[in-house]
């Protein structure tokens, strides 16, 4: 299942029989060796394809086949014929007529896919053997094929890329029939400045914004920009003809050129599509063999009112609508369908840029395979030609080996049996018991993720992950079961990587739950008691991650070492500290940010770390002002505040904390010292009035936390407020 092919079954001997005669393709015993045939005067790319077949065959049989270049050959010869036919509709076909075996593809790239499919289907060679270059020791060294074969294969998408590190290996991508941008793209992303940095570009190459040239953006009606970029494009292509795709994107901002030429083409201060697509058309007409793409992004979101050339394509990003729910079942479907339909009317090649991990936490299992499968079926139905599945790039993410494999299979054929593929992969890569344990766990989570109606964005904290699909009881039980196998596989990278991720997830769940059964601590008579298990888990995370050579856990490369240090510092401070304000009611008197209204963060027992997505309440529209009842915290001697400073995101410590009565009279005032560290979490303690002081707390009192003043919109990040 999963392979798309047409089998022509020729009747042999009886019209009711589909049994075929076998002919020997290779036999060491009888000295039967096929020759690899490619056309006379083949280019280097065809020669590389022949070498791929030769290499695979040598790994399998320890026999090195001869490669010959000649266009004509005797049909009675035992030859493996490799050909490219750009006019055929199938990606590749495998054919046999008596002794001649032919693999013919629509492109050299597809020829590599066809060669590897030959070994998958007709021999015992698998990818593990190929990657280790060790064949099957039990092979009889005889390969027999049916005397007549005619099988043709066509993928559901012409461009298929799961963007995970395993797919960056060319052997892997060719074996699994995927694309890899380094092997296909001459220019990728927002890299025009990098490509042109060697030139001293004239002013006319830059955008005119508000009547002045601005070097932060390009002018896409500029003849100078076209001249310099054309020069670099042809240099790149001539250095490697496989690099025939070029992404032409404006710089990553919202500036649009409004010079006279661009305005005449249709540009406005917010829409650069007319000039960008005119520029693309000009490139496409000049280089008809190349393919040029842009992206529906920032100032290029409006469909131009003219048709793009046939060798122009567009990437459409799902970043704003990828919420862990199949798009067709979401509130975004109608808009999405309309957008794709509109773009398809003007651009022949529409590709989807999709997302398959939680970029805030690469250890989140994020089991979106079933959702992705539904989305791929939708993309196919809407006429999308290519899909780029953005994964964890060069970084490890949980079970990325499984996800890369399944996504590769799914991009080729959207109708694969998902459970069968998951089970098959795990059985091939883990012991029988561990494979069963992993399969049951992961398939259950995949179903839970798919069936949940709750949205989970690709930038989410553990709280949202747990609410969507990750039941703590299930995770903790699985953790104990899997960890037993890790102890006996301490030098196996796959086990260590999964153990690192699961330990991190368990700690995150415990941190988020705060106190109680699933939390990191318990509360006894208002005193925090940190569980002894936490120290063990932190030691394991440190050990597993070092052995697995994993040092970060998200897109912004947050350090695991700092994560562990942050945990240890926090539990050292928290253990046996009083907490009189835990989950007590309070009133918020200030305005809250639209996306940050969960004020339970302030006294739920959970604590934040250096990542602002971990239990921090962010306030940018106003200071934070709370009203608290004195009776609820009557035994407290002081208030301990936790704040975050992350200057990259304009998050700063507050300037002043005030305690006021309900008449707005100041009872206590504390000015915080200025901290120069750009990224820091810190506690500040404010002593409450003693019975001997003149100013006393009123029955209801106000806590006013005043954010840093200055130019621009600064943000305040507050975590636990502990009365102790």
Language-model segment annotations:
Residues 17-98, 125:
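Acidic, contiguous N-terminal accessory segments
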Residues 18, 566-636, 640-653, 675-680, ...:
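Disordered, acidic Ser/Thr/Pro-rich linker "stalks" and the adjacent N-terminal cap
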Residues 29, 33, 49-52, 56, ...:
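Feature activates predominantly on carbohydrate-active enzymes
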Residues 224-225, 334-433, 440:
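Structured mid-domain segments that build the active-site/substrate or prosthetic-cofactor binding neighborhood
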Residues 411-604:
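Catalytic domains of carbohydrate-active enzymes that cleave complex glycans
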Residues 650-664:
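Short, surface-exposed beta-strand/strand-loop-strand elements in extracellular ectodomains
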Residues 666-692:
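Extracellular carbohydrate recognition and processing domains
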Residues 704-712:
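Short beta-strand-plus-loop segments that form exposed binding edges in beta-rich domains
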